[in-house]
Structures are given as C-alpha cells and as structure tokens.
Amino acid sequence: MAVISMKQLLEAGVHFGHQTRRWNPKMAKYIFTERNGIHVIDLQQTVKLADQAYEFVRDAAANDAVILFVGTKKQAAEAVAEEAKRAGQYFINHRWLGGTLTNWGTIQKRIARLKEIKRMEEEGTFELLPKKEVALLNKQRARLEKFLGGIEDMPRIPDVMYVVDPHKEQIAVKEAKKLGIPVVAMVDTNADPDDIDVIIPANDDAIRAVKLITSKLADAVIEGRQGEDADVDFAQEAQADSIEEIVEVVEGSKND
C-alpha cells in the first residue's frame, strides 16, 4: 500500500514542475510531459519513490539516527519546523550558515553561547545588568535562535538529512556529501539529482506539496522510533489508471 496516494499528490499540486526553460536535463526521466510551458512530474514515480524514502527514513530512525530537516525558503519554513518537532528531530528553516556541518565545532560554540544567554536570564543575571547590555544580549539571543534554535539540542552531526529544494540548499547538500551523510530530498524539475541519495520528484514551491511530503517523512521517523506501525495516515485511495487522464482533469498553478 502506498504511503502517499496519487489523489493526495494531485490535490497538493506535487505534479507541477518549473517552466520548461528552467529545467535541469538530468531530471528528464522524472518528467511525464509538458503543458503550457510547464513540466509535469511523473507522479507514478513519485508514489514509488516516496515509498522508498519513507522506508529509508523509517529504518534510519529505528536505528536511532539523528535526522536534520532543512528548508529555508518561505514555502517550506513552517512545515519543516513543525514536522521536525513532531518527529522529535532537528531543523534549519532560515538561512543555512556555511560550515554548519563541516565546521560543527564552531557551530557548537555558538549554540553554547545561546544556552549561556538563556541561562543568564533564567538565573536573574539580566536584572543586575544595565538595560543597554540586556538589550544587546536579547538581540544576540534572537539572532542565534533564528539560525540555530532548531539544532540547539542536536547531539551530533546528523546521520540523515532531509532537504526541501536541494537547488536552493546546495551548500547544505555539498556539506552533507563531503561528510558522507545521506540526503533525502524533494527534487523539482530545476534541480540536479546527482548529489541526492534518496530522490522524491516533487513540486518544492507549493506549501501544500511541501507539507504533504514532509509530514509523511516525519511519520516515518515516528514509526521507526516506535518500532511498530505508527498511527500514520497511509493512503487508502485507489491509484488512478492513467497519469495522462489525471493531467487532463487537474487544473491549478504551481504555487499554493
């Protein structure tokens, strides 16, 4: 039984790729057709590959993997944070700081500073400091929380990284590749799939599409951690007979 049904993918607009002039030819095998200057992703492949991604993440979680969710574009930021938290994992949903993985020691020092500032406030140290200094500390904390809050409690560099839009998150993907960290990603028609270990061909620009895929991978983590079938919403709907028929009946725009 598929983790995500064709109907769910269609309703979320997962099939809408980029304009044909913006495509990456390496994504050709995941493209079904072209309509009105837009590439249409082959959802039959997305269904199959989403299953594989689910199994990969579930099995990693079952082995106590640390999983980092990455999505810094506005369409992804909320879903990435919410689903990572729900799965008890970690996230980066604002700008990726160069060296987050490859210079983990330095990042840990910045996280330690964030925790120190929080501790100062909790212990009442702020009350003893001049208002100007407190304002500067609050500003520093806000900035550190924005960029590092999602990995504040991450015990080590991740064992697996899930990425929304590897085209935008090229630096993150390169760092993971350098360290041998497998990458699971939503890959749109403009991206290079070569550096992605587990590909999910999908529209990564629509909020609903990002939420759908990301939530399913969070379900995979939860199931893996529980060591048994989690209470996840497996797709019950029958698959459509023909993707060509589906393309004809679905209308909508790429962006949610």
Curated annotation (Swiss-Prot):
GO molecular function: structural constituent of ribosome
Keywords annotated in UniProt: Ribonucleoprotein, Ribosomal protein
InterPro entries tied to this protein: Ribosomal_uS2, Ribosomal_uS2_bac/mit/plastid, Ribosomal_uS2_CS, Ribosomal_uS2_flav_dom_sf
GO biological processes: translation
Short name of any one Pfam family annotated for the protein: Ribosomal_S2
UniProt similarity note: Belongs to the universal ribosomal protein uS2 family.
Protein name: Small ribosomal subunit protein uS2
